[in-house]
């Protein structure tokens, strides 16, 4: 996402970055400078500046985008921004866009803290599309923000368009992460169902690619069957065809499913298959930590013997 931001914001603007992995920051800055030079940018264009912490990023930015693994990480980052008091004033209200997938309650609490202290405007805008979408700039965002001002919504869409292709405004603060958890609940179940169906077909003697082609032309078609097929060799670009490396980690899927189930329980919403799916991902994570979540297929074949 940062690469697309640097490539699409005005050349004279400075992109300020902060990551706990300093090597990643340096590598990104070098790549950004090379890309700027190859596009004919001047000495003061295409700049990337390092910040020591999140507070420094907020102080120097009109728009701050955060992307973090867990709810507690998001809490810690925004607490570090707010605990030192007011930020330097700007002509335009600061935007804080959090693309993390976290629980709706935490997201709403952070939005309330940002808004009541008049620090800026907080937007929950989790992302869908994976590593491939991030690189290609084709990500989808679902965001929650106050609908009182169409000007604000258009400004948010403008920022998200720098990193992705589609942005849905789902409602007030917290709506974005709620929508993302609903989407990933479906994804988690579809991934298991696809893995089970492919394993079933293979054990019946069906050729995997022929089976997948049939499914993807029929009513069983879904993202795990078509794009992220879990059987090695069926989809050349899928993680399964490279030892389940890269892609969307099974630990992240397990985390998102836990968040969805917790939010469902909080709202009194029954989920017939949620608890079973959670147990599957818990076991798969223990046995195949670090792999793409489609490794559920490999786990099933191991159960089959």
Predicted features by range, described:
Residues 3, 26, 55, 59, ...:
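Amphipathic, non-transmembrane alpha-helical secondary structure
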Residues 50, 121-123, 208, 271:
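Hydrophobic beta-strand scaffold residues
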Residues 52, 63-81, 100-108:
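Beta-loop-alpha module in the N-terminal Rossmann-like domain of NAD(P)-dependent dehydrogenases
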Residues 101-185:
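Rossmann-fold dinucleotide-binding core
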Residues 175-296, 300-303:
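Helical "substrate-binding/catalytic lid" subdomain
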């Amino acid at each position: 996402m940062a690469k697309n931001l640097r490539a699409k914001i005005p050349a004279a603007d400075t992109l300020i970055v902060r990551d706990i992995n300093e090597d990643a920051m340096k590598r990104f800055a070098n790549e950004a400078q090379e890309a700027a030079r190859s596009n004919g940018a001047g000495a003061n264009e295409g700049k990337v500046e390092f910040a020591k912490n999140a507070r420094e990023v907020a102080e120097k930015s009109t728009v701050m985008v955060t992307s973090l693994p867990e709810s507690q990480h998001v809490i810690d980052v925004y607490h570090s921004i707010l605990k030192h008091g007011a930020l330097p004033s700007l002509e335009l209200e600061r935007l804080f866009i959090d693309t993390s997938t976290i629980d709706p309650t935490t997201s709403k609490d952070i939005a309330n803290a940002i808004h009541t202290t008049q620090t800026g405007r907080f937007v929950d805008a989790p992302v869908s599309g994976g590593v491939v979408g991030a690189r290609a700039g084709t990500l989808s965002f679902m965001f929650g923000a106050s609908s009182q001002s169409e000007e604000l919504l258009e400004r948010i869409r403008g920022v998200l368009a720098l990193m992705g292709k589609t942005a849905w405004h789902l409602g007030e603060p917290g709506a974005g992460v709620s929508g993302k958890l609903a989407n990933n609940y479906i994804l988690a179940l579809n991934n298991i169902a696809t893995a089970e169906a492919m394993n079933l077909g293979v054990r019946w003697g069906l050729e995997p690619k022929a089976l997948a082609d049939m499914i993807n032309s029929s009513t069983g078609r879904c993202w795990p069957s078509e794009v992220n097929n879990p059987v090695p060799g069926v989809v050349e670009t899928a993680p399964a065809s490279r030892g389940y490396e890269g892609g969307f980690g099974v630990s992240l899927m397990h985390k998102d499913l836990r968040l969805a189930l917790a939010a469902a329980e909080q709202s009194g919403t029954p989920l017939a298959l949620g608890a079973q799916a959670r147990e599957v991902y818990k076991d798969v994570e223990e046995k195949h930590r670090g792999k793409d979540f489609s490794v559920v297929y490999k786990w099933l074949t191991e159960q089959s013997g």
